[in-house]
């Protein structure tokens, strides 16, 4: 894998609060190699290591995107949801930003069935078919459509399992991570000082609670994906 320059700036990361971890009582000892100090009861992440792993992750997604691979971004907590959606849309990635439904990837046949029903309901709504139904029936279908849009809206164009999954907050998205591990899908995880770095293929030690930190990491990754996609389009 060719290493590239991704303009990862330590000062920029400090301004975004990427280096702030959790309280020293809430930590995973396996994160010790990624922690540089303690300050006022808080662990401080070693940003040099963060930059190294973020650069490695950018190289990986660039190479994958340049070969036409597909990505899924997962981040369902309130602080991450909007950033996940906007980053994914910008890079034409699939995303889950409300709730990971158990078995979404390991029970892919069920997910496919749900997606097909979601597509059918969208078509019926666009054709105005709901207005021709009894009010009660139309209301039921509208509720189903709204439910699907909330939980499956970010993956409505998925036709198969993703090639790489980017996860924001390992602990919050533990079910999604375990499903990826089970299926052998490579993962890039934003991990705070209370996480297990060994669970991800590429862990990126960073503050997973600050919106600015989440947005900065995502912006670097999707920028690399967009560049990779451009390379893929030019080579076709």
Curated annotation (Swiss-Prot):
<dbReference type="GO" id="GO:0009507">
    <property type="term" value="C:chloroplast"/>
</dbReference>
<dbReference type="InterPro" id="IPR023591">
    <property type="entry name" value="Ribosomal_uS2_flav_dom_sf"/>
</dbReference>
<comment type="similarity">
    <text>Belongs to the universal ribosomal protein uS2 family.</text>
</comment>
<protein>
    <recommendedName>
        <fullName>Small ribosomal subunit protein uS2c</fullName>
    </recommendedName>
</protein>
<dbReference type="GO" id="GO:0003735">
    <property type="term" value="F:structural constituent of ribosome"/>
</dbReference>
<dbReference type="InterPro" id="IPR018130">
    <property type="entry name" value="Ribosomal_uS2_CS"/>
</dbReference>
<keyword id="KW-0150">Chloroplast</keyword>
<dbReference type="InterPro" id="IPR005706">
    <property type="entry name" value="Ribosomal_uS2_bac/mit/plastid"/>
</dbReference>
<keyword id="KW-0934">Plastid</keyword>
<dbReference type="Pfam" id="PF00318">
    <property type="entry name" value="Ribosomal_S2"/>
</dbReference>
<dbReference type="GO" id="GO:0006412">
    <property type="term" value="P:translation"/>
</dbReference>
<keyword id="KW-0689">Ribosomal protein</keyword>
<keyword id="KW-0687">Ribonucleoprotein</keyword>
<dbReference type="InterPro" id="IPR001865">
    <property type="entry name" value="Ribosomal_uS2"/>
</dbReference>
<dbReference type="GO" id="GO:0005763">
    <property type="term" value="C:mitochondrial small ribosomal subunit"/>
</dbReference>
């Amino acid at each position: 894998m060719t290493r590239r320059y991704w303009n990862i700036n330590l000062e920029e990361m400090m301004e975004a609060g990427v280096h702030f971890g959790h309280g020293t009582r809430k930590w995973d000892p396996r994160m010790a190699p990624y922690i540089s100090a303690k300050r006022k009861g808080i662990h401080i992440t070693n940003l040099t290591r963060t930059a190294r792993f973020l650069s490695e992750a950018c190289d990986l997604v660039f190479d994958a995107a340049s070969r036409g691979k597909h990505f899924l971004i997962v981040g369902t907590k309130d602080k991450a949801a909007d950033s996940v959606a906007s980053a994914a849309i910008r890079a034409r990635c699939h995303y889950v930003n409300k709730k990971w439904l158990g078995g979404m990837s390991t029970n892919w046949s069920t997910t496919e069935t749900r997606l097909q029903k979601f597509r059918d309901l969208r078509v019926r709504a666009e054709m105005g078919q709901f207005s021709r139904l009894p009010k009660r029936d139309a209301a039921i279908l509208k509720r189903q459509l709204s439910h699907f849009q909330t939980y499956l809206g970010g993956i409505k164009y998925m036709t198969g399992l993703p090639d790489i999954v980017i996860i924001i907050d390992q602990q919050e998205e533990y079910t999604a991570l375990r499903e990826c591990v089970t299926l052998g899908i490579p993962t890039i995880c934003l991990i705070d000082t209370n996480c297990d770095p060994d669970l991800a293929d590429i862990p990126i030690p960073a503050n997973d609670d600050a919106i600015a930190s989440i947005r900065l990491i995502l912006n670097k990754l999707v920028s690399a994906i967009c560049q990779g996609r451009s390379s893929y389009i030019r080579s076709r």
